[in-house]
Swiss-Prot record:
Known role: Part of a membrane-bound complex that couples electron transfer with translocation of ions across the membrane.
Keyword list, A-Z: Cell inner membrane, Cell membrane, Electron transport, Flavoprotein, FMN, Membrane, Phosphoprotein, Translocase, Transmembrane, Transmembrane helix, Transport
Cofactor: FMN
Gene Ontology biological process terms, A to Z: electron transport chain; transmembrane transport
Species annotation: Hahella chejuensis (strain KCTC 2396)
Pfam family, one: NQR2_RnfD_RnfE
Membrane topology value: Multi-pass membrane protein
Family of this protein: Belongs to the NqrB/RnfD family.
Protein name as annotated: Ion-translocating oxidoreductase complex subunit D
Residue(s) carrying FMN phosphoryl threonine: T177
InterPro entries named among the record's database cross-references: NqrB/RnfD, RnfD_bac
């Protein structure tokens, strides 16, 4: 029997780290552009500033460690950390907030463990959690009013606000997030009165629904390109939706399903943050448990905790559990019996 002979290469190797990071950064562009349209130039400025800070901080540590800069910086992992943290920050947060959070993320959440591939926690979320706990005022009073409700500041105005704390008009940039607004307003009102507020449109968070749909589109691109798998995003969103349906059926007490899915950092967290290949679970079953845990914790912290958008803390808590999940969910190796976990084999 004759076999066809084809040209090499015959085996397809794994994607390079640089290409993976570049695809993830590219997939954030729809969400970044949507946020810029609805909330102004602040987010774009934050992303650029955070990316530059991340590269500078990584170069600083690599120099101290006497490692080649070009080899390590070209993987774009530092840039991705800056992009994700910049997207998570309030659009008009002071420049030093972005600088401190990004530098801490790179130095103390990534490089101190040995660099890419060794960090047990998501660096961007470590930086975000540090900022939220240390500087709560700066992290909660610089959210922007969406475009339909206020005139969006121009680039120079946004730049002046971020770097020189210039006054650009209180109504132009100061407001609480929709999740925070709903959680506090529902205490003294009903769902109908809360949804009548200007920040809510068609019973969703005005502007934020399009932001989340844009990040969803970027996440689907990553799945299509096989940069990530479906396990973590689907299990996280399914768990969040299930908790909302089972525990949040009374809209006069708890935020409804559509707010949990289409407000805040839900889609950004599901497709770009929770799927971090280093700090997340790696086995297929482990990813399902991991994503479900992130979704459940997100709902619990949003509903009964002090931080309405709880994705960062949910991801960090599940980072603790990732090694445990991987240990107990590894598939059986072909040709071997599955050993009992925790029992020494003779």
């Amino acid at each position: 029997m004759a076999f066809l002979r084809i040209t090499s290469p015959h085996l397809k190797g794994p994607a390079r780290t640089t290409a993976i990071m570049q695809w993830v950064i590219l997939a954030t562009v729809p969400g970044l552009l949507t946020m810029t349209w609805f909330f102004g130039w602040g987010t774009l400025i934050n992303v650029v500033l955070a990316s530059l800070t991340a590269v500078a901080a990584e170069a600083f540590v690599l120099t101290l460690r006497k490692r080649p800069l070009a080899f390590y910086l070209r993987d774009y992992s530092a840039v991705l950390t800056g992009v994700l943290l910049g997207l998570a920050l309030p659009p008009y947060a002071p420049w030093w907030v972005t600088f401190v959070g990004t530098a801490f993320a790179i130095i103390f959440a990534k490089q101190i463990y040995g660099g890419l591939g060794n960090n047990p926690f998501n660096p961007a979320m470590v930086g975000y959690a540090l900022l939220l706990v240390s500087f709560p005022v700066a992290m909660t009073t610089n959210w922007a009013t969406p475009r339909p409700l206020a005139e969006i500041p121009g680039f120079l105005e946004a730049f002046a606000r971020i770097f020189w704390n210039a006054d650009i008009g209180v109504d132009g940039y100061t407001m609480a997030t929709p999740l925070d607004t709903y959680k506090h307003e529902i205490v003294a009102g009903t769902a109908e009165t809360v949804f009548a507020l200007p920040v809510f449109g068609a019973r969703t968070a005005l502007g934020w629904e399009w932001v989340n749909l844009a990040f969803l589109a970027g996440g689907l691109l990553l799945i299509w390109r096989k940069i990530i798998t479906w396990h973590i995003p689907v299990s996280m969103l399914a768990a969040l939706a299930l908790c909302s349906l089972l525990l949040g059926w009374d809209e006069d007490k708890y935020a409804p399903l559509q707010l949990h899915l289409l407000a805040g950092a839900t889609m950004l967290g599901a497709f770009f943050i929770a799927t971090d290949p280093v700090s997340a679970a790696t086995s297929k079953l482990g990813k399902l448990y991991y994503g479900a845990g992130v979704g459940i914790l997100t709902y619990l912290i949003r509903t009964w905790g002090n931080y309405p958008d709880a994705v960062a803390f949910a991801v960090l808590l599940m980072n603790f559990a990732a090694p445990f999940l991987d240990y107990y969910t590894q598939p059986r190796t072909y040709g071997h019996r599955k050993a009992r976990r925790g029992v020494k084999q003779d």
